[in-house]
Design a protein with these regions (language model features):
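Conserved N-terminal phosphate-binding loop of PLP-dependent enzymes in the Aspartate aminotransferase
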Residues: 1-183
Length: 183
């Protein structure tokens, strides 16, 4: 574990909509941030309906939905964003890693004008954000993702890969569980 944690943040169990709704009873909660697929925790894919449930609860309680798609975004899951699997559009989207195709470090924080216009200069930043060269590389990487159908390829190859791993699991005790989406 890392620490100390920043004051004002609360950690709730992943994939638990009841715990999320309970935390929203606190009128001081302004946002909920989640990785759509828990990467560092061991590729933990949430139950179907979790992401759309987050969207519904955030709307109900007027809480911002922040999706940290640094590891899952830009087609890695077989959709452009992992939240696309459930049409759970976040209010704020965090991207990185694949954004530049691995060429240069770059990240981005995206939101509608309604949110972004509330942030004054100096109040917001992103690690590796704003580098003009990295921005050109990111734009080119996104064009390649689109032109070469890399999202669809990740979807198809991901299914193929997991199917083969499941077959290996039937033949060997080394593979206990196969999880994931896309590649």
């Amino acid at each position: 574990g890392f620490g100390p944690y920043m004051p004002g943040y609360e950690t709730i169990p992943y994939n638990d909509l009841d715990a999320l709704e309970e935390s929203f009873q606190d009128k001081n909660v302004c946002a909920f941030m989640v990785e759509p697929i828990q990467g560092e925790a061991g590729v933990v894919v949430p139950d179907e309906g979790y992401l759309s449930g987050i969207r519904t609860l955030c709307d109900k309680y007027n809480v911002l939905f922040i999706a940290d798609e640094v590891q899952t975004g830009i087609g890695r899951t077989g959709k452009m964003l992992a939240t696309d699997y459930e049409d759970a559009r976040p209010d704020i989207l965090i991207l990185g890693k694949a954004l530049s195709g691995g060429v240069l470090p770059v990240s981005a924080v995206l939101a509608d004008d309604e949110i972004m216009m509330c942030i004054r200069p100096g109040e917001h930043g992103s690690t590796f954000g704003g580098n003009p060269l990295a921005c050109v590389v990111a734009k080119s990487a996104l064009e390649v993702v689109k032109e070469e159908n890399l999202v669809e390829n990740a979807f198809l190859r991901g299914h193929q890969f997991r199917d083969r791993l499941k077959n290996l699991g039937e033949e060997s005790e080394l593979v206990k569980k196969v999880r994931g989406k896309g590649l």
